[in-house]
Amino acid sequence: FLFSPVGLAGLVLLAIVVFGCAYTVDQTEQVVITQFGRPVGSPINAVDSASGAGLHFKIPFVQTANSFDKRILEWDGQPSEMTTRDKLYVVVDTFGRWRIADPLRYFQSLRDERSALSRLDDIIGSETRNVIARHDLIEVVRSDKDRTPEQDAILAESGGTIGVLPPIRIGRHRLEDQILAAASPKVGIWGIELLDVKIKRLNYKQGVIEKIYDRMKS
């Protein structure tokens, strides 16, 4: 009977059902189960989930396993021209690290990484612009809070005769912390945890460097 057409068809149908029921969750992913497009149950292998990675089962043809990355992910912003408090223009290039902390909320609001990166572009870009606008260029350039004036490499390389900058009050690292603090709650509503934001690169136009020299001479 097993080798008859009916028996073979039954075996094929059974295999389809079994494979449709079982699925494996990797250590690097977390899963939200949906039934007819709506989430059911708790996320699997999430940070605060009771169920972990391994073999799991769902109702075939009715439920779908939606997988999301559990690892730390990177965000790389586009260089953007911004204005400092002292009305100088600088091109700021930022990057950050983030992760999906609440896969259910992430699924309900964003669904995929492309949408998440687009939202991160908007929020981090906006908060970076706000922070830069509240501080003078010297605070963006310098990355330490040393009270002793020191040579700034970028200005020195520009060929100017004056490269000694005044001491700073805050410094770039504190500005990065301010960007992170402002952006974190805004992306948190989408189930995203923003781990850090860093200023990767700063570019000045020649006119900006000349203005810095003029101010330091005066």
Predicted feature descriptions by range:
Residues K198-S218:
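Long, charge-rich amphipathic alpha-helical coiled-coil "stalk/tentacle" segments
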Residues F19-A133:
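Hydrophobic membrane-anchoring helix/hairpin
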